[in-house]
Amino acid sequence: MKSFCVKAPAKINLFLHVVDKKETGYHLIEGLFVFANLSNFLEIKVGEKDSRYDNSTVEFINSESKINNQYNTVMKAVNLLLRHAPVRTKVTVKVVKNIPIAAGLGSGSSDAGAVVRTLGKLWEIDRTILNEIALNVGADVPASVDSKPVFVRGIGEELCHIKKFSLPTNVVLVKPKKRFLSTPEVFSKHEGKFSEPIKWSDDAEKDLLKLLKETRNDLQEIAISFVPEIKDVISTLESQEGSILSRMSGSGVSCFGIFDSEENAKAAAVNIGKKQPEWWVCDTQLIV
C-alpha cells in the first residue's frame, strides 16, 4: 500500500465575470483565481494491485456540515481516475476539513484537485486526460490541480497561468458562520447583462491591482440578496487599516480583504474576530 499526505489550498476568486451562457445551461466565466495557505489535508492510500476498486472510500473529518461519503467531488475524482489506473486497485481518502464548505472558497474543488494531482502523478496519466477528468468533476477543479495563480476562461477549462504576481499576498478571509450558498442557485439568478470579455495579455500581470479595480464579482449582488450580511462583511474589511481591496469570493458567502502588510492583516483579523464573534475569520497568505 502507498500512502500520501497532501494539502488542498483554499481558492479565492479575486474577480469573477459572467460573460455568456451556453445552451446547455452552463455559464461562461472569466476570473482570476488564487490559492491560500489555508488548506484541507488529505491522506490518500492506494491499495495493492487486484484490490476491489469498488471498495474505495472517502471520509470527511471536522466538516462544519455533513457531507455524503458516496456522492462528493473526491469520490467522483477517484472513480474517474481509477479507469486509468494501470492495475485494479482501491483508494481510500481521509479529508480533514479546514476550509468552510459552500462558501466560495473551493473546499470541495480543491480536495478533488489534490486527488487528481496525486493519483495522476502516481499512475502517470496524461495531462490532457487529467484536465478532462478535472473538468468532469467540477468547473473549479482544473485550476485547483496546480493551485497556482491563474486567469480562467470558459466553464473553467481555459487556463492562463500568471507568470509574475504583482499583488501583496496578505489576505483576511471572513464568512458569517452557519451561512451557506448553493453555487447553482446563485448562478441561476444571474439574469442581467453579461460582462464584456477581457483581452488578457502579459501586460495585465504587470499591474494586477489596477486590473482588480476595473473588475468585480458579477455574483456579489445576487449573493447579497440571499445573505445581506455579506455587505456588512465587505464594508468591515474595507474599514480596516491597511486594506487595499475587499470583495466576495466565488458565489459566496466568504469575502476576502487584501492588505498592505502581514502585520495589518493579522491585526484586522483579530479586530474583526473580537467585534464579530458570529463570523469565521482567518488571516492567511496567498501561494504565488
From Swiss-Prot:
Keywords: ATP-binding, Isoprene biosynthesis, Kinase, Nucleotide-binding, Transferase. It comes from the Bacteria. Its EC number is 2.7.1.148. One of its GO terms (biological process) is isopentenyl diphosphate biosynthetic process, methylerythritol 4-phosphate pathway. It catalyses: 4-CDP-2-C-methyl-D-erythritol + ATP = 4-CDP-2-C-methyl-D-erythritol 2-phosphate + ADP + H(+). Pathway: Isoprenoid biosynthesis; isopentenyl diphosphate biosynthesis via DXP pathway; isopentenyl diphosphate from 1-deoxy-D-xylulose 5-phosphate: step 3/6. SUPFAM superfamilies: GHMP Kinase, C-terminal domain (SSF55060), Ribosomal protein S5 domain 2-like (SSF54211). ATP binds at P100, I101, A102, A103, G104, L105, G106, S107, G108, S109, S110. The keyword Secreted does not apply. The keyword Nucleotide-binding applies. It is an enzyme of class 2 (transferase). InterPro entries: GHMP_kinase_C_dom, GHMP_kinase_C_sf, GHMP_kinase_N_dom, IspE, Ribosomal_Su5_D2-typ_SF, Ribsml_uS5_D2-typ_fold_subgr. Disulfide bonds: none annotated. One of its GO terms (molecular function) is 4-(cytidine 5'-diphospho)-2-C-methyl-D-erythritol kinase activity. The active site is at K11, D140. Catalyzes the phosphorylation of the position 2 hydroxy group of 4-diphosphocytidyl-2C-methyl-D-erythritol. PANTHER family: 4-DIPHOSPHOCYTIDYL-2-C-METHYL-D-ERYTHRITOL KINASE, CHLOROPLASTIC. Belongs to the GHMP kinase family. IspE subfamily. This is 4-diphosphocytidyl-2-C-methyl-D-erythritol kinase. It comes from Wolbachia sp. subsp. Drosophila simulans (strain wRi).
